[in-house]
């Protein structure tokens, strides 16, 4: 059912992922001021003359973000109408629109008015949530028409643990974005020690970097527990099991890419992979959260 909606939702999901990676590229290359303090124009021009590479990166991000934002709104309206009989469709459609608007306002505000590092870090976190909302709408489009949707019966304790893990994952995403915006990516040399110290303190750029290392490592342990719990108690739910295993594999990849950033001196490709993996991980956990909150069959 809804073949065109399925195709469109997949394309939109890919578009959101591209916007997310473009945003990470803007931050990694310091291109946030590539268009000066003007928005939506670039240095007051529709097409900037003799643009520097930073200008091209920033302005292309704005253009693609605008196009994908329009695509998300269309998807939300389409899903609201075609999937309204599905439990999560309206809430996800509403969330997708609100998140993309909020994301755009944060980006525009950062350019025109400037923002603190704490506020700027929200931008990437909202992007991850926006991706998750669109991905879940895409999944709903593919689920529609099936005799039974995935609705595993799990314990209350398991549900609460998943809620805790996804909330904690978002906090880790925020801490990583804060590290980037505070230019603390290379504040800790070496691994596992930080500048030759077991505990360098929690102040300044070094503290921000070290804190992110610690909370990231703890996330890996939390997802290991989630995988073991799922395999031991809910192995008969194949989708739930594979989501838990995938989440753990993703966080392992995230851990490795994070270490690689230090040893490659913040190589651009490694940094983008780091941003990509955590965004996919958050979407996977969002899917798990969605299916375990459904009334069981």
Swiss-Prot record:
Heme o binds at residues 61, 123. The chain crosses the membrane at residues 7-27, 63-83, 94-114, 119-139, 157-177, 211-231, 243-263, 272-292. It is a multi-pass membrane protein. Heme b binds at residues 212, 274. This is Heme A synthase. Residues 28-62, 115-118, 178-210, 264-271 are extracellular. It is found in: Cell membrane. Pfam families: COX15-CtaA (PF02628). Residues 1-6, 84-93, 140-156, 232-242, 293-297 are cytoplasmic. GO terms for molecular function: metal ion binding; oxidoreductase activity, acting on NAD(P)H, heme protein as acceptor. Catalyzes the conversion of heme O to heme A by two successive hydroxylations of the methyl group at C8. The first hydroxylation forms heme I, the second hydroxylation results in an unstable dihydroxymethyl group, which spontaneously dehydrates, resulting in the formyl group of heme A. Its cofactor is heme b. Keywords: Cell membrane, Disulfide bond, Heme biosynthesis, Iron, Membrane, Metal-binding, Oxidoreductase, Transmembrane, Transmembrane helix. Its main location: membrane. Pathway: Porphyrin-containing compound metabolism; heme A biosynthesis; heme A from heme O: step 1/1.
């Amino acid at each position: 059912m809804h073949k065109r909606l399925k195709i469109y939702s997949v394309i939109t999901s890919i578009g959101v992922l591209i916007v997310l990676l473009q945003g990470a590229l803007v931050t990694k290359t310091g291109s946030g001021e590539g268009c000066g303090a003007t928005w939506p124009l670039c240095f007051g021009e529709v097409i900037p003359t003799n643009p520097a590479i930073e200008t091209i990166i920033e302005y292309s991000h704005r253009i693609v973000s605008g196009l994908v934002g329009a695509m998300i709104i269309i998807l939300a309206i389409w899903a609201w109408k075609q999937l309204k009989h599905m439990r999560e469709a309206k809430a996800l459609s509403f969330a997708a629109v609100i998140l993309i608007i909020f994301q755009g306002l944060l980006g525009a505000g950062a350019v025109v008015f400037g923002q603190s590092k704490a506020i700027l870090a929200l931008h990437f976190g909202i992007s991850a949530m926006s991706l998750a909302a669109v991905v879940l709408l895409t999944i709903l489009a593919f689920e529609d028409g099936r005799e039974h949707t995935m609705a595993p019966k799990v314990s209350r304790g398991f549900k609460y643990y998943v809620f805790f893990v996804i909330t904690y994952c978002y906090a880790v995403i925020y801490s990583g974005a804060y590290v980037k915006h505070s230019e603390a990516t290379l504040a800790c040399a070496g691994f596992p020690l930080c500048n030759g110290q077991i505990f360098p303190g929690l102040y300044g750029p070094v503290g921000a970097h070290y804190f992110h290392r610690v909370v990231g490592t703890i996330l890996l342990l939390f997802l290991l527990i989630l995988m073991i719990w799922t395999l031991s108690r809910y192995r008969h739910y194949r989708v739930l099991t594979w989501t838990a295993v995938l989440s753990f594999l993703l966080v392992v990849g995230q851990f490795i890419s994070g270490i690689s950033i230090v040893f490659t001196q913040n190589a651009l490709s490694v940094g983008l992979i780091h941003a990509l993996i955590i965004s996919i991980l958050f979407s996977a956990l969002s899917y798990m959260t969605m299916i375990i909150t459904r009334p069981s069959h």
